[in-house]
UniProtKB/Swiss-Prot annotation:
The gene is glyQS. PROSITE patterns: AA_TRNA_LIGASE_II. This is Glycine--tRNA ligase. ATP binds at residues 210-212, 220-225, 294-295, 338-341. Homodimer. Keywords: Aminoacyl-tRNA synthetase, ATP-binding, Cytoplasm, Ligase, Nucleotide-binding, Protein biosynthesis.
Amino acid sequence: MEEDDDMAATMEEIVAHAKHRGFVFPGSEIYGGLANTWDYGPLGVELKNNIKRAWWKKFVQESPHNVGLDAAILMNPKTWEASGHLGNFNDPMVDCKQCKARHRADKLIEQALEEKGIEMVVDGLPLAKMEELIREYDIACPECGSRDFTNVRQFNLMFKTYQGVTESSANEIYLRPETAQGIFVNFKNVQRTMRKKLPFGIAQIGKSFRNEITPGNFTFRTREFEQMELEFFCKPGEELKWFDYWKQFCKEWLLSLGMNEEHIRLRDHTKEELSHYSNATTDIEYQFPFGWGELWGIASRTDYDLKQHMEHSGEDFHYLDQETNERYIPYCIEPSLGADRVTLAFMIDAYDEEELEDGTTRTVMHLHPALAPYKAAVLPLSKKLGDGARRIYEELAKHFMVDYDETGSIGKRYRRQDEIGTPFCITYDFESEQDGQVTVRDRDTMEQVRLPIGELKAFLDKKIAF
């Protein structure tokens, strides 16, 4: 999608703001960086952790069906043989012969067609068809403008390394490209030890690695990324009911944390897009400044994964239904959310530059209080009031992430907190010494109320709940 000036500026503003305020830094920056690697700064790690906690709260803690898991990143290579990743986990790649730039062929074509006003899903088309489209629409290299490309070929996305001291094929091992397989191989362990009856789910948050051909768009597409995945197992024949349930549940989770409904859409996969093992897949997409992009993939994976691992391992994954005495391989619904993508989406959704009545502009991040890095900032009106203000800070810090700032005018301190999304500023003034009350300022409305110091914890507890 071709960016207009406003969109490009908005993305540039987000990247600049993220670095300036300690949300995200370029990786290995003092050595010139490493392409498409990013480090979460002090505020970014708090925001991302809060998002992960919010996901775990709704998908595991409050769910009667689901339990958690933390599987190893390194797995027996037979896992990836069984799952099909070694043979089929590929992206179509094409090189520009002129400038040697490497492109993911389906995305190159889709972007070029979108600029011509044509919407087409190219993912999943045969390689020969992609070559035909490149010629038919006279597609040029975005880097140099040349139209001289290599043939489209498949490129395996797995990162390969070696375990042990010798680099031989017998010691080949892979960084996992998804967290899901660690769940599938542990299906029986979890079901037996937790005495779970169908339907039930296994949730996991963890790092995955894909040697993407064309990563980009800040933290949207990177080679190292974090996933929040649920594999929900159910009786065959009930999978589409649960598929619809999880689609709605995932959308409601985003909305409950303040995401603008106008910025998200549910897009069903076409028959051509569907993975061979799926009988239904829907993406929840977010309207980023660079176009619509996938946040969450909800897929009905049937019994493909458990069957594959049964066949390759010899382990029996049949489930015995005690009520009906039926024996079957469970079907699986997978809602898979990118932690980095959804963190970026919440940052973009929250970012605002407001024009105030006095003609000035303030930058503010309207993050849901549950997600905000700091829940409150304690601000003594004068450094002379530091002792009393610090006592409040120390008490609140036992329960929340709280900032303390005594530098600069109170107005400038308010603006600093607005820019990082702190929902409440607590000002300790000279009257506080006498009446035991403080002024609490709301980030979004900028309205102020006086509250007794002893009521601050209950006030914040109520405000950050979701």
